[in-house]
């Protein structure tokens, strides 16, 4: 039975409500959209089409950005469907890589804040810092050890431009850039009322300009954030732009 025959047969089995939902879902693929491959060595043209279709399928039933877990699965499925060998890490609480692509361990991040910057990346939770000693030098060492668990890092950034217009951006954060944190200038925020007191690790270029900051958050989660990471130091692999029709 051909694909068209299968669709016709299935259509006849749906009730009116299911047919209405099916039509809405099909119309999702007819939205105004642009998929741009801008750089990179892993992804082929098929991946950008497949992943873009998965993004629009998600937004057929949700007004929220793709969560990290949904990103991981959509990313992995799109890679495999496009002919790239990929598999998710077996443990979802793995303190390192999230996915393996052609035998390369990769960490995945997402960013979807309402006030997201076009020029600077912010990762609100890079890793948990645990309940050990709160000494910035030791925390920095833990971050550098964490980097040993993966070779590449990709973050999916979501921009809501208007009620019906949104965009996704796939960016690679070079591991070599993050490794520059070994020379970070550490500063404890002594005036903070938080306990333990938070601190910063500033990564500067040769002209003392800030490349990015490590923020050791001493709050309830005790986590490491990456702040003010200039997009100019990263690789934008692709952009997906969508304009949805009004309901």
UniProtKB/Swiss-Prot annotation:
EC number, UniProt record: 3.1.21.4
Keyword presence, Nuclease: yes
Keywords associated with the record: Endonuclease, Hydrolase, Magnesium, Nuclease, Restriction system
Top-level class of the enzyme under EC nomenclature: hydrolase
Co-factor(s): Mg(2+); K(+)
Example GO biological process: DNA restriction-modification system
Catalytic reactions on record: Endonucleolytic cleavage of DNA to give specific double-stranded fragments with terminal 5'-phosphates
Domain of life: Bacteria
GO molecular function: type II site-specific deoxyribonuclease activity
SS bond partners: none
Pfam families in alphabetical order: SmaI
InterPro entries according to UniProt: SmaI
Name of this protein: Type II restriction enzyme SmaI
Taxonomic classification: Bacteria, Pseudomonadati, Pseudomonadota, Gammaproteobacteria, Enterobacterales
The encoding gene: smaIR
